[in-house]
Amino acid sequence: MRSLLALPCLVLLSAAAPGTPRLALPLACTPGKDCFLPNHVDRDPGPGVRDFRCGAQTYEGHTGTDIRLTDHAARLRGVDVLAAAPGRVVRLRDGEPDVSVRDPAAPPMAGRECGNGVVIDHGGGWETQSCHLARGSIRVKVGQAVAAGQPIARVGLSGNTEYPHLHLTVRQGARTVDPFLPEGGAACSARADGVGLWTPAAAALAYRSGGAVLNAGFADGPVDNARVEAGGPPRPGRNAPALVAYVRAINLKGGDRPVLTLTGPDGVVLARAEGAPLDRSKAQWLVYAGKRAPPGGWPAGLYRADYAVLRNGQTVLSRRFDLRL
């Protein structure tokens, strides 16, 4: 996403600090808990995709690192975007609406794919570009010096996106740099440690080859993405008409088999969802399993849900969560 580079009205300044920057976590979040990394830089120069681990956690032509929130409810509560390294603000854009690209009301995206964004010069030809920021949330001005970890805006839904996330592009001159493996070219390594340009504290943005659980919980009826994005259904009680466990995961591969089992207080399986293997890779996948309430309501006790993703007969992702009624 390079659309901020083309804005002729913006003042261009340079920061003095030379050398390769070390990148701090650019979001005020805890990786693996309330933020996740669905997409890396696409290192494949031609058709096809390749991330730094030689996997496919990216998409065609993707030039940055995406760090997403769990849902729109988190975005509305407000999550700060942080400067990844010290530098000086050289370009910015504000005023783009926070609306999903899938919304018929979304404005034209050509040349404005980044949405609201901030570009910071870190010296030595290095810069970072933060995209999809919330309208009206940018706290910095062109020419302003910033420190690593300083809040510069909040996560939004502006530009070419359908879910709340930060898109962070790293460049040295005209070259896009993959912060997990900054060496240039299309090379990748299944054994790359992924530290790259990141500080030790940001290393929690670990590569998750088995995908990741984005949301998990219980509901009193069928669950869809809209309910999950709104923050999840309310906690069911003993008089709920049904008891449903749900999980939404990201970065699953074709052939993966998600399995979700709901067990009652007596250890008896109440429901189990196990479909056919996925026909293709899924950026996100929602599964739920549930049962209608018995006469007289749900017995008191601990209800347990077990989620697993099976790949070639091996469990690559799992989560257990409970509900006490």
Task: List the predicted regions and their residue ranges.
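Acidic, glycine-rich catalytic/binding loops that coordinate metals and/or anionic ligands
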Residues: 18-48, 108-110, 139-144, 169-246, ...
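A short tyrosine-centered beta-strand micro-motif
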Residues: 299-310
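Short beta-strand elements
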Residues: 314-325
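Solvent-exposed serine/threonine-rich low-complexity stretches and specific carbohydrate-binding patches
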Residues: 270-281
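Aromatic sugar-binding surface patches on proteins
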Residues: 279-293
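Short glycine/threonine/proline-enriched tight-turn/helix- or strand-capping micro-motif at secondary-structure
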Residues: 44-83, 92-110, 222-240
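Zn2+-dependent peptidoglycan hydrolase active-site motif and core
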Residues: 76-78, 84-135, 170, 258
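Short, well-structured beta-strand-loop connectors
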Residues: 80-91, 139-154
